[in-house]
From Swiss-Prot:
Written domain comment of the UniProt record: Lacks alpha-helical transmembrane segments, suggesting that it resides in the membrane via beta-sheet conformations similar to those predicted for other outer membrane proteins and porin.
Subunit structure: Component of the ER-mitochondria encounter structure (ERMES) or MDM complex, composed of MMM1, MDM10, MDM12 and MDM34. Associates with the mitochondrial outer membrane sorting assembly machinery SAM(core) complex.
Topology in the lipid bilayer: Multi-pass membrane protein
One Pfam family it belongs to: MDM10
Keyword Secreted set for record: no
General function of this protein: Component of the ERMES/MDM complex, which serves as a molecular tether to connect the endoplasmic reticulum and mitochondria. Components of this complex are involved in the control of mitochondrial shape and protein biogenesis and may function in phospholipid exchange. MDM10 is involved in the late assembly steps of the general translocase of the mitochondrial outer membrane (TOM complex). Functions in the TOM40-specific route of the assembly of outer membrane beta-barrel proteins, including the association of TOM40 with the receptor TOM22 and small TOM proteins.
The protein's name in its UniProt record: Mitochondrial distribution and morphology protein 10
GO BP: any one term: phospholipid transport
Length: 473
């Protein structure tokens, strides 16, 4: 679960159209949210308030080993009007989970329409007690596509009483670059991330789009980072590949990543798929080419809908549903299929509660694929009888597939969830993590446990156990 200050920072990025998914450090963010999620330790309560649209404060108190806490302040040069308190915020925005990667064409349009991003800034500071530890962060937008990020930590237990990290970031639709400097070990780093291909470059004029492609909105990102510690003369290098796509027949997204560290010989691959609106599955395989050590990690998250009298799923109750024009033309030529078509549509709408985009008032385009559970099942009414496909048919089928993709994403965003259950395990480490996060009255609650197997007695033991309450106005 995000802290309130982290939530405000993400709202600041959304207000200024800064794409976090286009940063190299977030290339494996989806798998980390499902496998490496933190477990609360002890008791913690967080009370926050946004006094104005430009400023907010937060107070945290916990009893881990001893009574301690912190006091934080945040200021934004632009109004953060897209924020909500813990009573009204959706769990999709308050909890780290599956992240849908958008094609570069969508990112380009967002950045092009950006008006408020230039010269915007965000200031954040936190003071811990007891003790004299301080942390601060400054975000300064230099241009529409570049910003300066500074993070500072002041702690008497650190060398020279603290450290500072400076990020100079350039983020465009096609690529992102970062130049990083840290006072710790005089560390210098360079990160790059490139998005291959373009959503507008696909050409299927000679192929029926009802047959292929079965996946669209695909994004292939490749990146690398190079580090050099000037004091110890130690290098660092890693590379990563991310492939994200969404099925055109079901709209379900999936993400695959491959990360390599050639210096230590570590290879890591992940596969994450959103199996339904309320569930996600993730797997991760680690391998070392030098020691031949390997590890398999599995995890999933399962959302629960809020208890309501009506069905939590959006429905077609107030929408006029119609098929695509190409399908109607085919049915007129083959009347024997009309009865089967009508019967199937009735069963289809009762079984799959997916709300699509609206067109011309209350008209709604439905999915032309007959069986949403089978991504390889093609509706024959969409296939041309003579094997040729016109430009109009191409556009209609493309728009329909985009509608199905957008419908699934809208259904995820608009669903009213009350809680989420997360589970992850590692076969080699023999560790099990269980986390429950949800809404209790006007509070957001996070509680979980981390279990491991004692190598001597072979009995389970608790590594972490705690509960956290968060309240924000």
């Amino acid at each position: 679960m995000y802290t309130y200050m982290e939530y405000l920072q993400k709202c600041f990025y959304k207000s200024t159209n800064w794409n976090e998914d286009n940063i190299y450090s977030n290339i494996t963010a989806t798998s980390q949210a499902l496998l490496d999620f933190p477990i609360p330790n002890g008791f913690k309560i967080d009370s926050s308030s946004k006094t104005t649209d430009y400023s907010a404060s937060s107070f945290t108190l916990s009893n881990h080993h001893q009574i301690n806490g912190s006091l934080a302040y945040l200021y934004s040069s632009i109004p953060l009007t897209n924020t909500m308190g813990t009573k009204d915020v959706s769990l999709q925005d308050a909890i780290a989970g599956f992240r849908i990667i958008e094609p570069s064409v969508g990112l380009r349009s967002k950045l092009k329409n950006n008006i408020m991003s230039n010269r915007s800034s965000l200031l954040y500071g936190r003071m811990y007690f007891p003790g004299s530890a301080l942390e601060a962060m400054i975000i300064k937008r230099l241009t529409k596509n570049s910003q300066l990020l500074i993070k500072c930590v002041n702690n008497p237990h650190l060398e020279k009483n603290g450290t500072m990290i400076v990020y100079l970031q350039n983020n465009t639709a096609k690529y992102s670059r970062e130049l990083i400097y840290s006072t710790n070990e005089a560390l210098i780093g360079l990160r790059c991330l490139y998005n291959l291909g373009d959503a507008t470059s696909h050409n299927f004029t000679n192929i029926n789009p009802a047959v292929i492609p079965k996946f669209d909105n695909s994004v292939v990102s490749i990146g690398t980072e190079i580090w050099y510690a000037a004091r110890t003369m130690s290098p660092g290098l890693s590379a990563a590949l991310r492939y994200s796509t969404r099925s055109t027949s079901t709209g379900k997204p999936l993400t695959m990543t491959l990360a390599i560290n050639p210096i230590v010989g570590h290879v890591s691959s992940t596969y994450t798929v959103k199996t339904s609106v309320a569930s996600t599955f993730c797997s991760k395989y680690d391998f070392n080419v030098f020691s031949y050590a390997s590890n398999l990690s599995l995890g999933f998250e399962l959302y629960s809908y809020a208890n309501k009298k009506k069905n939590s799923f959006p429905s077609f109750e107030h929408h006029e549903i119609h098929s695509s024009s190409e399908e109607n033309k085919y049915l007129k030529k083959h009347p024997e299929l009309q009865r089967h078509h009508n019967l199937h549509h009735n069963l289809h709408h009762q079984r799959v509660p997916i709300k699509s985009h609206k067109y011309e008032g209350n008209r709604t385009i439905i999915n032309p694929i007959q069986n949403l559970d089978n991504v390889y099942h093609i509706n024959p009414t969409l296939l041309s009888s003579n094997g040729s496909t016109s430009t109009t048919t191409n556009n209609e089928n493309t728009n329909t597939s985009e509608t199905v993709t957008a419908a699934f994403q809208n259904l995820v965003n608009e669903s009213d969830f009350s809680s989420v259950f997360k589970f992850s395990t590692s076969l080699n480490d023999k560790v099990v993590k269980i986390l429950w996060e949800g809404r209790l009255k006007e509070f957001l609650v996070s509680t979980g446990v981390k279990l491991s197997l004692n190598p001597i007695t072979n009995t389970p033991e608790f590594n972490k156990l705690g509960i956290s309450f968060s309240y924000a106005l």
